[in-house]
Structures are given as structure tokens and as C-alpha cells.
Amino acid sequence: MHYKKYAELLKNGTYFSHIHSPTLLYPKGKVMYAQYGNSPLQGLNSQVTNLNLIRKVVAASAEMDSFKKLPNLQNNKLPLNNLKARLNTKAIYISNEEAQLTVSKIGTPNAIETDVPGTIKNAPSNTLLTHRSFKFFVNKIYAKPLISLKKTKETKPLLLGKTGTTLTQKGLNPFQSLFLNTKSSSPSTARSFGTKNIVNTLQIKKIVHKFENSYSKLTEINLITINLASANRIRQWAEKTLPNGKVVGEVINPETIHYKTLKPIKGGLFCERIFGPLKDHECACGKKFNIKNYLTKTVNNSSIQPIAESRQTQPNTQLSLNLQKRYFCRICDVEYTYSIIRRTQLGYIQLASPTTHVWFVKGIPSYISILLDMKKKHLQGITYNTETLTLENSFRGRQLLPVSPSSIFESWQKIMKKQYPEKYNLTNTMIKIKSTNTLPLRVSQPNSNTSYSYMPNIYIPEGEGEEKTKTKLKKTTPLNAIAQKGVKYKKPKTKKALYKQYLKNYYARKPKNSNQAEAVSFGVNKVQLPLTAFQQRNKVYFYKSEKRNWPVLTTVAKMQYIVSKKGWFKLIQYVIKSAESYGAATPTKMDGLQKMSLLTKQA
């Protein structure tokens, strides 16, 4: 249909059958629709739920805003005495009069009658192809939706887009495009106005005044943290300031109720001023809520409601806090409210000194005990005042802590020896040195570069039984490395640094012109030699030269470890002049010192 012919028919109030949207049409694209409840104010969003549109064209002039150019209507009546007041109204009133729609001005929204369902049938005309019947509600408010449309030419209402192409060519309904232009993210609902006619079904977008249950950016939770409340935050939760200036919330009395009246004591653990009334809307004086005996105060309430949608802001992005009045008694300062708030209302006790939190004392791990380096048992005793700790004793534990690396290593040695005795206390380990050479073995002074020298071709068997392996020692290897090699079964260079700094204190010095046994010690770490070496006759033979012409065979009668003051171990070897060289039998059931004295006397 040409737009000029459409404009002429529109002025005459002709109904168009190709318009599939049941609406009340103003020229220039203004649509009226039914609204349940009071009409919205100008400037707010006028879209509401349960819309009831009427399929009828109310024709008027294209210049509807100008009351000077108002032509006569053919099918409808506009009984308006004051056209200026008509144009300034925010809604129109529709009633059913003789199968025609009559538009009249409404007074107040409160004067609306109840809903009465009715039916309107459109009589056939030259341009109407079929009979269309639909239901509507009489005596309802039909408000103008606030749809911002650009002004179009008078002869082309709602048919041309910005490019000049008709909306019908694009497959769009021009009246349906009005609702598509409305900005709303709410789900749409469909309402049918006829049971048999499917054409009368229109999808209308619904406004939700509450937060949606579906996903939205506003209700998205990115992070949840759980912290301990600080003292100021606890005081903020528990305190409340009355209109007369009193601050209530601190528990200052340890008592609960009075033994005679059985009422809560003021400022106690059951105080009504702090936690709330015992009975609903009744103070401690026994007075019930009355407008004459209360104090009011406006405080922030936790209820949050969304602000209505507006065209300038995005929907559901602003929140408004409702202000609620709270009423208090003038005499006893008890709030007039429900007694159930005693379950949630907080109070606080002001402590003279800070105390520990049970999570950090009894928790696993106990962070305070780790920080103070105390046992949890002693920490709980101090926390619950069953034990005392003075400053003098508190710093005593610090003196026992190792400071230097050597002391740390020594303490570690002791701990590992107790924890793993089978690893650090070797058993059935024997050292046997054989040699056929008669080169002398000398003990040098501690200040010399070479500590010990020994005869070549010395073999040290390692292990037991068939697993014994012999290690040939080089001539340049010092004797202390031999001892370490035999004890630890490791290369001497790897662990040499462990005992090097203490080695000079353990050298044995032989007195001149003395026939007593020599005590030769080596700085050896970790491993203890067994004491069964002498009992099993596993002897270590050394050849020592003297001023005589023949060598004297000496034996190591006893080998043992002695713990020094600094935590290191000494390998003490008692070198005894053997009586075997003179043909005498060596006693076997005596300890090392007895043998030493006996052999010394024999010599």
C-alpha cells in the first residue's frame, strides 16, 4: 500500500487488516496499552507486566499535539471539553459504549472500577477482510509508553526507516518495531487476546523489579575471603547509638538475671537494651508500643532494592538503601521490635589486655607456638593462666639455640645419632692392616705439613665374608685418612674437611725415653668402631723402630670413640709393646688399660 493512501485511510480512522499488532494507535507512532495499577509518572519507565492491548485504530489528525487542528472523527468520539487538559493528561480512559470505543479523560487513578471482561467485535468494512473479535477489560487505564522515536514526515508514519526503505519490505511489523526498540533485558512473556485467533498473540517484554535468578554481572562473586574481625569491627557491629545520645552494646556486668524478679540485669549478659526485648514490641518497663512513648531514629537497613529502570542508566546497576525507623522507649531505652532479634544481636566485652585466638593456639599447626618456639602444652598453660613466664626465662631458650654453623652441625649430629642409631652406629666393622715391610712408622709434630706416614702396600679389607674388598692405600695418603677410610668406607678427600680443623688437637706425643703406651687419636666423624676388636683377636699391627737393631711389634689393644666437648668423636688407639716379640702370651681377658700396665711392667 502506498504511504499516501495509508495516510488518508489513517485520517479517516480505517482499520488495516495487515497490521497484526492489536494496538490503539495515535498518529506519529504513539501507542496506548493497558496497564494494571496506577499509571507511572513521566520520566520513569512505563512498561509493566500483564499488558492488555486492544486491536482498534483510534484515528485523529497527524498533528495530534496541536489541539487547533483537530478534525471530526468518523468512528470514534472524543468528548473532551478542555483539549489542552486532554493533551496534558498522562492516561486516557476507555469504556465500552455501543460496540464503540470512547476515549475520555480520567480523574485520579484511585477512582478506577473493578475489571469487567467484555468483548468488542469489529464490523466489516471495505478494507476489513475478516471479522476479528478479542477480549479486553473495561474501565482500565491505557497509558502512553515512553518510546523515543524521531519525528517522521506526516505522510509516512512508521513505514519508512532511516534509509527510506519500508519496514514491511524488510519483513518487520512497523508496530512490533516499537516494542523492539525498547531497552530491556528482562525475559518476554506472551499474552493472547483471543482463543482461536493466533494473530492476536503479541510478545511483550516484562520488567522484573527484583534481581534475576539467572547469571548477571551484578550478582557475580569473584572472591570470598574469611578474616578475623578486628576490635573496631566488633564494636561497630555491637554498638548502637540511641536518639538521646546514649551508646549501648557493651556488657559491663557479668550477672544474668535478678534472683527475685527473674528479669535481665541492666548491662548484663541478658540485657534487653543490648540484645533486644523479651516480648515482641514491649520494653523493659512493661509498656507496649505506642506512638506517644517512643523515640525515633532513622538508621540504615540492610534491605537492598533495585532502582527503577531509566533511559539514562543501565538496568539493575544501581542500588538504593531503604531507611527504616527504629523506636526506643524513653525510660528504659529498650527498642520496640521483635524478640527474635536476640538471636542475632551482638554485644561485646571490653578486655583489659588483648588475648589470643583459639584458632592460632589450638589449631594444627599452632602458629603462635611455632613463632615463639614453645610447646603447645606450655603455650596453652600461659594462655589459660595456669603457668607463668617471666622475661628472664623467656630469653633463656635463645641461649640454647645454635648460633654458629659448627654448633648447628653438632646439634644435628646428636639428633641424627638418636634418631637413626643403626645408620650412624656401625657394628661388626673391622680394620686389619697387614704388612711385610719393616719401614718405620713415625708420629710427627702437629705443626708439620705431613701428619703421619706409613708403610706402603697396606690393604684395608671392607665388608664381611665373601663381600670383603681390599683397598690398596697409596704412600702419600696420611694415616688419619686411613682411619677414616676404614671406618666410613668412603674416599678420604670427600670428608676430610669435617675434621681437618680439629685434627691438630688430637695428635699424640710420645714422651722421650718412655716405654709407656702411646695414645694416638684421630678426628673421625659419625661412626663408632666396635669394642669387640680386641676380644676377637682382630689386631692391627704396626712396626715401630727404636734405637735397637731389631723392630718391635706393637698392637692396637683397644679402639673406641670418646665424645669430645664439641660433639666430635675421638678414635683412641692404645699402642702397646707386645710380648709376642719376646715369646710371651698376651692376656685376652683384660681391658686395654690393664693390658697396658701389665705389658709395660713386662717390658
Curated annotation (Swiss-Prot):
Its main location: plastid. Keywords: Chloroplast, DNA-directed RNA polymerase, Metal-binding, Nucleotidyltransferase, Plastid, Transcription, Transferase, Zinc. GO terms for biological process: DNA-templated transcription. Binds 1 Zn(2+) ion per subunit. Signal peptide: none annotated. Its EC number is 2.7.7.6. GO terms for cellular component: chloroplast; DNA-directed RNA polymerase complex; mitochondrion. GO terms for molecular function: DNA binding; DNA-directed RNA polymerase activity; metal ion binding. It is an enzyme of class 2 (transferase). Its cofactor is Zn(2+). It is found in: Plastid, Chloroplast. Zn(2+) binds at C283, C285, C329, C332. It catalyses: RNA(n) + a ribonucleoside 5'-triphosphate = RNA(n+1) + diphosphate. The keyword Disulfide bond does not apply. InterPro entries: RNA_pol_Rpb1_1 (IPR007080), RNA_pol_Rpb1_clamp_domain (IPR044893), RPC1 (IPR015700). In plastids the minimal PEP RNA polymerase catalytic core is composed of four subunits: alpha, beta, beta', and beta''. When a (nuclear-encoded) sigma factor is associated with the core the holoenzyme is formed, which can initiate transcription. DNA-dependent RNA polymerase catalyzes the transcription of DNA into RNA using the four ribonucleoside triphosphates as substrates. Belongs to the RNA polymerase beta' chain family. RpoC1 subfamily. In C.reinhardtii the gene for this protein is split in two. This is DNA-directed RNA polymerase subunit beta' N-terminal section. It comes from Chlamydomonas reinhardtii (Chlamydomonas smithii). The lineage of its organism: Eukaryota, Viridiplantae, Chlorophyta, core chlorophytes, Chlorophyceae.
